[in-house]
């Protein structure tokens, strides 16, 4: 690399960037994702930068060459981008690379040499650039928290996420979506580390050297999109792994609990939280520090009687390369953090295997991680039911002809002319030309004695058929089927909707409702628009809720369990009340189910679901059984 003299560049502060321009910028790295393979053939890197204006800019950078993307090692590094195109994405400015894009990266620590990292053979760097880097360093030292996730193995604790700088000693392909890295950083973990069996694997590296280092070596499993990068790394290289997950794995149950605990290391699939791998050059300052640590490492003097090789082949906690389709521990770890569902509460609960849940009494709450083996009903429209929140009864939603018959059978008597035109409503009655001269009355509810606009008007209809009710509901705010009572209008029947708004029909519970006369709607005046809850309250109706009632068959490899899904509007983020009449929502629901329970492939390839389950007792006749229900769980945003 060499410097070239050129006319000074103009750099734009981040708060002055404009959509549609091409700019040169400096910034401090606030967040980044190391280069990863995008959905196409290019590599992608995401970088969020900030400058003295305290404005952030996220940049999406693509290149067919891994090395052409910014060489960023940690949060706090300083970058210079030339020819960055500014566009708007989701109402925020975003930077993307365009023709001629170039980048430099600098260590962000005050006092360190100002040395540029770049794959370019020539680049410009002036005294003014030097001043800008040093000014950003000083500003960042006061305003940006230094990255605290970089740790040594000796400081690693379970159930955390870390960045690790290390040297690669050996590697092996476990299967198409899992790859083993054996690494060290010169320090030893507090707990013994988990060992992956290499007996049936094609291993690259010096096993005798690894055996001499013994407990200074840890096994790391990387998954999915990281496998391609891991496969290309040469043994002996220095690495930084980002967002490495540590957790405890119980070992041999025959030993004491403290002796059997082992520390696992996993680099999960995906790029969330900046997860990834970066090869560090030998000239990097952090590699210099690592080399000193490796040279000064306290190597074990003697081997234990078991030795690493024996442990790798015989340790009960070791991972075997099973070719079966059963769910295995590493199969689950591979997909952690990319679950198709997320928890909205109770994240503190520890995960419980299904085999343990099936042996315990109810009621209990559990956190599980499993795959959706199957579900019922297969016709998703049949899953929409009506649930009473008070008595918990469930009933079918009346459809088409059945609803029309309910309206027809309930409206057998002609409207009572004495109940026309009260202070509450204005009435209009007409007689149909066919159908035996059926009389239909429409009562327009007033607001403070005045008829409101149709978009705000509630109308009461007597003697109407489904086609007439549907036509009126498309033109007026709300429609209520009623009949003439002895002294005033009454709700038609709770077999029919008590309120219709657009295409949505609102029903009430026959068992729990205590109906009041229509005149009670007077209590709703001056209280805003007509809502199902306010109308139900005024008329003594306990409204039924639209829910998806489904049965999920869950499988985590230890057991199979059937669980009800009732809190499904929260789960799917789709209103159950609208899915029956909205083709787009039906397609969305089908898409979600196809993603969490894909047709035409083996269960092994299904995504994992992280769910909360609650168990409860149910008595049916003389039989007492335990049922399970999914709660406080929702489909992840990338699935919806």
From Swiss-Prot:
Gene Ontology cellular component terms for the protein in this record: chromosome, telomeric region; nuclear telomere cap complex; nucleoplasm; shelterin complex
Domain of life of the source: Eukaryota
Keyword DNA-binding on entry: yes
Keywords: Chromosome, DNA-binding, Nucleus, Telomere
Compartment list: Nucleus; Chromosome, Telomere
Molecular function as annotated in GO: single-stranded telomeric DNA binding; telomeric DNA binding
Location, primary (coarse class): nucleus
Transmembrane segments: none
GO biological process: chromosome organization; positive regulation of telomere maintenance; telomere capping; telomere maintenance via telomerase
Protein family (similarity comment): Belongs to the telombin family.
Family annotation (PANTHER family): PROTECTION OF TELOMERES 1, PROTECTION OF TELOMERES PROTEIN 1
Function per UniProt: Component of the telomerase ribonucleoprotein (RNP) complex that is essential for the replication of chromosome termini. Is a component of the double-stranded telomeric DNA-binding TRF1 complex which is involved in the regulation of telomere length by cis-inhibition of telomerase. Also acts as a single-stranded telomeric DNA-binding protein and thus may act as a downstream effector of the TRF1 complex and may transduce information about telomere maintenance and/or length to the telomere terminus.
The protein's assembly and partners: Homodimer or homooligomer. Component of the shelterin complex (telosome) composed of TERF1, TERF2, TINF2, TERF2IP, ACD and POT1. Binds single-stranded telomeric DNA as a monomer. Associated component of the telomerase holoenzyme complex. Found in a complex with TERF1, TINF2 and TNKS1. Interacts with TNKS1. Forms heterodimers with ACD. Identified in a complex with ACD and single-stranded telomeric DNA.
Name of this chain's protein: Protection of telomeres protein 1
């Amino acid at each position: 690399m060499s410097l070239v003299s050129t006319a000074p560049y103009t750099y734009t502060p981040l708060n002055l960037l404009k959509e549609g321009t091409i700019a040169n910028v400096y910034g401090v790295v606030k967040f980044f994702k190391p280069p990863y393979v995008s959905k196409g053939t290019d590599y992608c890197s995401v970088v969020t930068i900030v400058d003295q204006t305290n404005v952030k800019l996220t940049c999406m950078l693509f290149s067919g060459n891994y090395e052409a993307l910014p060489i960023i090692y940690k949060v706090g590094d300083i970058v210079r981008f030339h020819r960055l195109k500014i566009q708007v994405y989701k109402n925020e400015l975003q930077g993307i690379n365009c023709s001629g894009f170039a980048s430099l990266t600098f260590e962000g620590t005050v006092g360190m040499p100002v040395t540029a990292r770049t794959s370019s053979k020539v680049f410009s760097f002036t005294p003014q650039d030097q001043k800008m880097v040093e000014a950003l360093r000083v500003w960042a030292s006061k305003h940006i928290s230094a990255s605290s996730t970089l740790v040594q193995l000796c400081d690693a604790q379970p159930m955390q996420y870390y960045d690790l700088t290390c040297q690669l000693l050996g590697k092996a392909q476990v299967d198409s979506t899992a790859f083993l890295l054996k690494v060290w950083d010169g320090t030893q973990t507090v707990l013994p580390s988990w060992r992956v069996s290499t007996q049936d694997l094609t291993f690259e590296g010096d096993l005798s050297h690894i055996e001499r280092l013994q407990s200074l070596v840890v096994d790391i499993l990387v998954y999915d999109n990281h496998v391609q990068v891991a496969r290309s790394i040469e043994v002996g290289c220095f690495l930084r792994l980002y967002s490495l997950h540590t957790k405890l794995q119980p070992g041999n149950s025959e030993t004491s609990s403290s002796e059997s605990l082992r520390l696992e290391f996993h680099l999960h699939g995906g790029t969330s939280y900046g997860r990834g791998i970066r090869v560090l050059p030998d000239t990097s300052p952090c590699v210099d520090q690592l080399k000193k640590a490796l040279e000064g490492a306290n190597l074990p003097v003697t081997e234990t009687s078991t030795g690493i090789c024996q442990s790798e082949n015989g340790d009960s906690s070791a991972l075997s390369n099973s070719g079966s389709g059963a769910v295995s521990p590493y199969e689950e770890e591979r997909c952690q953090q990319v679950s198709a569902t997320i928890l909205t509460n109770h994240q503190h609960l520890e995960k419980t295997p299904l085999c343990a849940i099936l042996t315990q009494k109810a009621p209990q709450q559990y956190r599980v991680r499993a795959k959706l083996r199957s579900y019922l009903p297969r016709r998703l429209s049949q899953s929409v039911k009506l649930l009473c929140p008070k008595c918990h009864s469930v009933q079918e939603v009346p459809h088409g002809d059945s609803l029309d018959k309910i309206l027809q059978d309930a409206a057998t008597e002609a409207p009572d002319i004495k109940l026309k035109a009260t202070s509450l409503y204005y009435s209009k009655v007409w007689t149909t030309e066919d159908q035996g001269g059926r009389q239909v009355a429409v009562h327009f509810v007033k607001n403070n004695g005045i008829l409101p606009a149709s978009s705000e008007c509630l109308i009461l209809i007597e003697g109407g058929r489904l086609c007439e009710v549907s036509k009126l509901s498309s033109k007026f705010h709300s429609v209520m089927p009623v009949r003439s009572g002895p002294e005033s209008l009454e709700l038609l029947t709770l077999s029919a909707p008590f309120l219709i708004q657009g295409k949505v029909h609102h029903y009430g519970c026959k068992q729990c409702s205590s109906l009041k006369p229509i005149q009670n709607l007077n209590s709703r005046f001056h209280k805003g628009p007509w809502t199902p809850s306010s109308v139900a309250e005024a008329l003594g109706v306990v409204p039924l809720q639209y829910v998806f009632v489904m049965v999920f068959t869950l499988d985590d490899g230890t057991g199979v369990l059937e669980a009800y899904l009732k809190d499904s509007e929260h789960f799917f983020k789709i209103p159950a009340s609208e899915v029956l009449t909205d083709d787009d929502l039906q397609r969305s629901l089908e898409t979600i189910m196809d993603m969490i329970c894909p047709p035409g492939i083996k269960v092994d390839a299904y995504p994992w679901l992280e769910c909360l389950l609650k168990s409860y007792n149910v008595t049916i006749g003389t039989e007492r059984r335990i049922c399970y229900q999914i709660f406080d769980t929702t489909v992840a945003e990338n699935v919806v």
